[in-house]
Curated annotation (Swiss-Prot):
GO molecular function, one term: immunoglobulin receptor binding
Cited function: Serves to link two monomer units of either IgM or IgA. In the case of IgM, the J chain-joined dimer is a nucleating unit for the IgM pentamer, and in the case of IgA it induces dimers and/or larger polymers. It also helps to bind these immunoglobulins to secretory component.
Classification via InterPro entries: Ig_J
Disulphide connectivity of cysteines: C12-C100, C71-C91, C108-C133
Subcellular location: Secreted
Superkingdom to which the source organism belongs: Eukaryota
Full protein name: Immunoglobulin J chain
Pfam families assigned: Ig_J_chain
PANTHER family recorded: IMMUNOGLOBULIN J CHAIN (PTHR10070:SF2)
Glycosylation, residue list: N48
Organism field: Oryctolagus cuniculus (Rabbit)
Keyword terms, alphabetized: Disulfide bond, Glycoprotein, Secreted
Oligomeric and partner information: Part of the secretory IgA (sIgA) complex that consists of two, four or five IgA monomers, and two additional non-Ig polypeptides, namely the JCHAIN and the secretory component (the proteolytic product of PIGR). Part of the secretory IgM (sIgM) complex that consist of five IgM monomers, and two additional non-Ig polypeptides, namely the JCHAIN and the secretory component (the proteolytic product of PIGR). JCHAIN-containing IgM interacts (via CH4 domain) with FCRM (via Ig-like domain).
A Gene Ontology term for the protein's cellular component: pentameric IgM immunoglobulin complex
């Protein structure tokens, strides 16, 4: 009965929202929904997390309605047929890019860095999250 349900676990914006049903302390014959919102503010992150030379981020914005959208497609079965559906009808366009405040460890991030070798300098792609970029 004390189990929490994870509503949002957004690693990109460091937010986790859980929900659980508890007894109303003011009226023990009723249940209420308790929501817990955990936001970890990564203080030493960059404006552009893929560019280690960009300035430190000083502004963090969170929109609860956007965080709670369930836009990832999921498969459901109706009348012995499998359909792909989204749990929200207000999902952003495909070109929408969420602002990430830290690395999503499931994504591969790279950046170009200057490498000097034998008197010449050239730009080389460097991996910022190696575990996500290279298969096991």
């Amino acid at each position: 009965e004390d189990e929490s349900t994870v509503l949002v676990d957004n690693k990109c914006q460091c937010v986790r929202i859980t929900s659980r049903i508890i007894r109303d302390p003011d009226n023990p014959s009723e249940d209420i929904v308790e929501r817990n919102i955990r936001i970890i503010v990564p203080l030493n992150t960059r404006e552009n997390i893929s560019d280690p030379t960009s300035p430190l981020r000083t502004e963090f914005k969170y929109n609860l309605a956007n965080l709670c959208k369930k836009c990832d497609p999921t498969e459901i079965e109706l009348d012995n047929q499998v359909f792909t559906a989204s749990q929200s009808n207000i999902c952003p366009d495909d070109d929408y890019s969420e602002t990430c405040y830290t690395y999503d460890r499931n994504k591969c991030y790279t950046t170009l860095v200057p490498i000097t070798h034998r008197g010449g300098t050239r730009m080389v792609k460097a991996t910022l999250t190696p575990d996500s970029c290279y298969p096991d």
